[in-house]
């Protein structure tokens, strides 16, 4: 973890320090527990293909917060489409912070269900399920069909 992040964390009010944990690099085998415990995956990136970390978080039952208008990262609109996250209306730090607060309120008011988030996204994103959908699409195309 860069020293400036530790300094930033130490300057936070004590009540906020308890809610923000700087974990550094986390081994793959521990990621699911971290995602589930954190509840929210904040995606501040603008330039990633499908943001694998967000997909992993969804499968672990966490929700996603990110910028709305990002053509290079348009998967986020899909990731929040099933009561599983919030997008910021504008691409700015203030707007992203507001979306994060909105998502925290959604969890606090019971609008997010980690089991439902995980069940839904695992059914779509796990490798076996994805392969079945690709094969079905291929077979449908071979037969002249247009749907799955």
Segment roles from a protein language model:
Residues 46:
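Aromatic "clamp/platform" in nucleotide-sugar-dependent glycosyltransferases that forms part
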């Amino acid at each position: 973890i860069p020293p400036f992040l530790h300094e930033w964390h130490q300057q936070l009010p004590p009540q906020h320090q308890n809610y923000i944990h700087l974990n550094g690099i986390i081994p793959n085998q521990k990621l699911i527990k971290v995602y589930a415990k954190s509840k929210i995956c904040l995606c501040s990136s603008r330039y990633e293909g499908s943001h694998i970390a967000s997909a992993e978080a969804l499968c672990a039952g966490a929700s996603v917060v990110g910028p709305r208008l990002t053509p290079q990262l348009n998967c986020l609109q899909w990731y929040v489409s099933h009561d599983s996250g919030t997008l910021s209306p504008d691409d700015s730090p203030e707007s992203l912070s507001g979306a994060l607060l909105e998502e925290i309120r959604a969890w606090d008011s019971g609008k997010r269900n980690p089991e439902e988030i995980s069940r839904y996204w695992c059914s779509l994103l796990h490798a076996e399920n994805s392969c079945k959908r690709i094969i079905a699409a291929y077979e449908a195309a071979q037969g002249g069909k247009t749907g799955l």
